[in-house]
């Protein structure tokens, strides 16, 4: 469960290392975001000499959460960290690689490009 002021790791090579959620896209007073939700975030830590810089406002899709994800078949998936992938206005990832495992549910939300870049889909 991601809410405003939550710090997330970045799971791609876009140049950002850490994000802080400032708004959840979708509803006017939505409190929490889960896997597959789009958030507005600010970059808190970035790699030097990359296109994305610190204190830049970006959109990101959540790919991993510490909070459990329960599937319809009863399987429960939990990750060790909260992570997101930086995207552009069309929903395409800004990076060319994705690190770590990605949930299968992202395919339902039309983030197929992120799923295809991921090394492991759970």
From Swiss-Prot:
Xref: SUPFAM superfamilies: Ribosomal protein L14
GO molecular function list: large ribosomal subunit rRNA binding; structural constituent of ribosome
Record key words, sorted: Chloroplast, Plastid, Ribonucleoprotein, Ribosomal protein, RNA-binding, rRNA-binding
Gene Ontology CC annotations of this record: chloroplast; cytosolic large ribosomal subunit
Compartmental location: Plastid, Chloroplast
Keyword Ribosomal protein annotated: yes
Pfam families linked: Ribosomal_L14 (PF00238)
Primary location: plastid
UniProt-listed Gene3D superfamilies: Ribosomal protein L14 (2.40.150.20)
SMART domains membership: Ribosomal_L14
GO biological process: translation
Xref: HAMAP family: Ribosomal_uL14
Family that this chain belongs to: Belongs to the universal ribosomal protein uL14 family.
Assembly description: Part of the 50S ribosomal subunit.
Protein's job: Binds to 23S rRNA.
Protein name stated in the entry: Large ribosomal subunit protein uL14c
Species of provenance: Guizotia abyssinica
Organism taxonomic ancestry: Eukaryota, Viridiplantae, Streptophyta, Embryophyta, Tracheophyta
């Amino acid at each position: 469960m991601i809410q405003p002021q939550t710090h997330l790791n970045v799971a791609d090579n876009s140049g950002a290392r850490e994000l802080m959620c400032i708004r959840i896209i979708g509803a006017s007073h939505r409190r929490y975001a889960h896997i597959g939700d789009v958030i507005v975030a600010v970059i808190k830590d970035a790699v030097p000499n990359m296109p994305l810089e610190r204190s830049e406002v970006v959109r990101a899709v959540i790919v991993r959460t510490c909070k459990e994800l329960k599937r319809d078949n009863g399987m429960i998936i939990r990750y060790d960290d909260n992570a997101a992938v930086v995207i552009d206005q069309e929903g395409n990832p800004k990076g060319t690689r994705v690190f770590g495992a990605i949930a299968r549910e992202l395919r339902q939300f039309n983030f197929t490009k992120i799923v295809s870049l991921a090394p492991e889909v759970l």
